[in-house]
Each structure stands twice: as C-alpha cells, then as structure tokens.
Amino acid sequence: LKLAVFDICGTLYHDNTTYSFLRWLSKKNIIKYNKSIMNAPYILRALNVIYSSFSRKDVYRILQVKQLSDFSFDDINKWAREFVDELEENRIYSTNILMEEYKKQGYKIVIASATIEPVARAIAQKLGVEYYSSTIGFLNNKCTGEINKDLLFLKKDTLLHLLKKAETTIVVTDNYTDIELVLVSDHSHIIVRNDRDIEKWNRCLKANARKVDFIKKDA
C-alpha cells in the first residue's frame, strides 16, 4: 500500500472550511449571524489557539458548531454540497495538482481533516477520495450541535490501521497539529505562507526536516 494523506483547510483549500461553511449559511439566512461567535476579536481567537494546544479542545469551533442544532441530517449535507460547489475558486491549485500526481502513481489518497463531516464528505465526493473527519451528533435525524469526535489531535490514531499497512506514506498539510503524522511519514509536503513558517517547522522537525519540502501558499 502506498498512502498519501492530505489535510483540507489551508492545504487543499485556502479556507477554514467549517468556519466558511457557517458563514455561508449565515449569508443564506439559514443561521443567524452571531458576531461574537463568527467574528471574535483576534485576541480571543489567539487565546483559543493556545488553550486548545493544551486542552485539545477548540472552544471557538465548539461554539460555532452549536449553530447547527436542530437542522436535519439531509439538509446539512445538502447545504454542505452546495457550499463546496461554490468553494471551487478557493482551491489551492498546487496541492490539488499534487494529489492528481499521487493518484497517477498508484497511491491510495485519503483526506484527514478536523473539519466537520458534512463538509469533508462533500469535498471527498468531489475529489473521488476517502475521508476522515470530525463528526457531529445527530439524534432522531436532528443535529445536536455537538462535536462527537474531534479529529484535530487524533489524525495519527485514526489513520493507524492504514499507516501500519503502508509501505510508503506521504503527508501533505499546513497544520502544526499534524506534526505526529509528519514524523511517521516517509516524506511530507508542508504548505507555508512565508519564510517564518518554514523556520517554525524546521524548529519543530529538527533532524526530521530533511524529509520534508515546503510549498508556498500562493496558488
């Protein structure tokens, strides 16, 4: 098995797709625009990033997803497909081309993302690949607004059954929380914005930096 694992947010698409999906729903007047949740001040979002790195809970995203409460499974998934169709112009073309190259080389392609499942499923269907994502709760076909399983810090554990079988593993990501996946890969393509990101990754990777290459997030 030759395995290539792709992140979604900031890797295949410029967007944080959960957040963008909820903003899309608010623009369609499906959910109410809640400024304190959808457009929190930078300082609060920065504190949330720090808190989540220790607690492994993204409070900001938990609050965002609660806005899906009481919508039906079918409606949420239909809206997710419509949203992804409109997201086409926000693809990062260099990584999408890279995915096609690995497909041609016979790699099994999976996307692994902390984005919510309806969005990940719609993207996976569009790309023709398997997916692993965060799951949200449903009871009697209605969304509970809860994140049942958050993949943010669990990608390696979730993919372990594939990693054990893989003769070669490629990882493509921009996400520092994917460091465990990067470390067990044979080679990784890291998506970065600038030289500062490269320096940060090199500090994290240390001797493992030799098995990665960096792709600037410009297209």
Q: Whereabouts are the PLM-identified features?
A:
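Residue-level signal for pocket-adjacent positions within structured domains
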Residues: 7-8, 63, 131, 142
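Short, well-ordered alpha-helices that flank and scaffold nucleotide-derived cofactor binding pockets
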Residues: 23, 27, 125
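Catalytic cores of large soluble enzymes that bind and process phosphate-bearing ligands
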Residues: 13, 68, 151
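Periplasmic-binding protein-like
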Residues: 21-22, 214
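A short local loop/turn or secondary-structure capping micro-motif enriched for an aromatic residue
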Residues: 22-23, 140
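C-terminal cap/substrate-recognition subdomain and adjoining C-terminal extension
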Residues: 1-2, 78, 85-219
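Asp-based phosphoryl-transfer active-site loop
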Residues: 1-20, 182
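A metal-dependent, Asp-based hydrolase signature
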Residues: 17-18, 26, 30-97
